[in-house]
């Protein structure tokens, strides 16, 4: 997938009513994960998350959907998670469908925004799709 396709997929996801059960899988699909990968992650043996309602994709991201108002607490749990470290996750992400918080664990950069604004920040996660980004020192991008 290219950046335009990813932006479109993330925008479509954010426009739909929030589905806590399927959000992590649809988020990964938006960044180019194949149906077979999603199917494997839905299976309990592939998902090694140690956080409630979490989904861990090895070498990529640890995502958790949480109750409203708990995004910061859950992001901290993801950060402290042994599974996050063991799986060498590059990102952690917590959302309740209202708020959206993420951290790039390689740079320490943190993203906090309303869930509805998350498509504006799709570039934060482009490395999940194998797209490298070069940041401008002055603007941060």
Task: Annotate the PLM regions.
Residues 1-61, 65-141:
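Short, basic/polar, glycine-containing "phosphate-handling" surface segments that engage DNA
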């Amino acid at each position: 997938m290219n950046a335009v396709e990813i932006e479109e997929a993330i925008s479509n996801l954010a426009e739909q009513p929030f589905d806590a059960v399927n959000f992590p899988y649809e988020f990964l699909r938006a960044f180019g994960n194949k149906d077979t990968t999603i199917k494997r992650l839905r299976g309990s043996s592939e998902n090694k998350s140690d956080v409630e309602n979490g989904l861990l994709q090895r070498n990529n991201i640890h995502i958790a959907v949480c109750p409203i108002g708990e995004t910061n607490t859950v992001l901290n749990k993801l950060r402290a998670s042994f599974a996050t470290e063991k799986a060498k996750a590059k990102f952690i992400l917590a959302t309740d469908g209202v708020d959206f918080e993420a951290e790039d664990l390689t740079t320490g950069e943190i993203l906090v925004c309303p869930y509805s604004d998350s498509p504006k920040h799709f570039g934060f996660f482009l490395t999940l799709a194998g797209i490298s980004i070069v940041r401008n020192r002055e603007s941060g991008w």
